[in-house]
Amino acid sequence: MPSYKSRKNNKKIKNKRKSRSSRRTYKNRRAVKGVGGAILGMGKDGCIIDSLNCPPYSKDAGYVAKLFKENHAVNAHLQAVLLSLDPDEKRFAQYKVPSDCPSSSSSFADNEDVALCKERLGSDIGTIAFMWILEPVDEKHLTKSQYRYLRESLEILHSHGITHGDLPGNVMIHPIDKMPRIIDWGNARISHDDDALVKQMDNNAFLMHFKIG
């Protein structure tokens, strides 16, 4: 039977080989460059677009952008009702979802690479990508006005029989007026009856996740 010292040395050699292999795999993964514009996956209300290798963000391998389709609503009737309630989208942002990649930042959107990305992605998708530049929200540190505004938005939905169904993680802040917008209506629905249970789930999610900081 090998001695304790021998077993320990063998384990070190094995871990060293594994570490080298992991580093090599990570390096190869980072070396892969996106061609841009190709649709990698598509769901019921959005699609994944291959990354663009834009110079300001070429330090890493590139980025994958998640863009929601503008003309293929999950629920056309729901979208029509939301537009009638909020035609300027000051409370409910529809399909103008910010990209997952840094290209949605204002510093990037202001430079001339926007035109290149629109050309590479296609005019429709490119327009959606840069039409809204929303910012993540710190759910635990809302101002009093932001908290009250979001509460009012939820009450407007419920008064018209609309439940969101997935509130946490789907609230963004508009960079100009600094007020919250509710996004991603994939799980939302209009209930013709007074569905108290679903409304209570919305209310519980609001009270649990959103706080004045």
Model-predicted segments: where are they?
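Feature marks short, surface-exposed loop/turn motifs that line or immediately flank catalytic pockets
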Residues: N71, V137-K140, R189
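Arg/Lys-rich, intrinsically disordered low-complexity tails that mediate electrostatic binding
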Residues: M1-G36
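ATP-binding glycine-rich loop module of kinase domains
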Residues: G37-A93, S104
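Polar, enzyme-active/binding microenvironments
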Residues: G43, R151, W185
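Conserved structural core of kinase catalytic domains
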Residues: E89-Y147
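C-lobe/activation-segment region of protein kinase-like
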Residues: Q146, S159, T163, H174-G213
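Catalytic toxin/effector domains delivered as secreted proteins or via bacterial secretion systems
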Residues: A65-K66, H77, Q94, L116-K118, ...
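Conserved kinase catalytic-core helix
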Residues: L83-D86, E135-R181
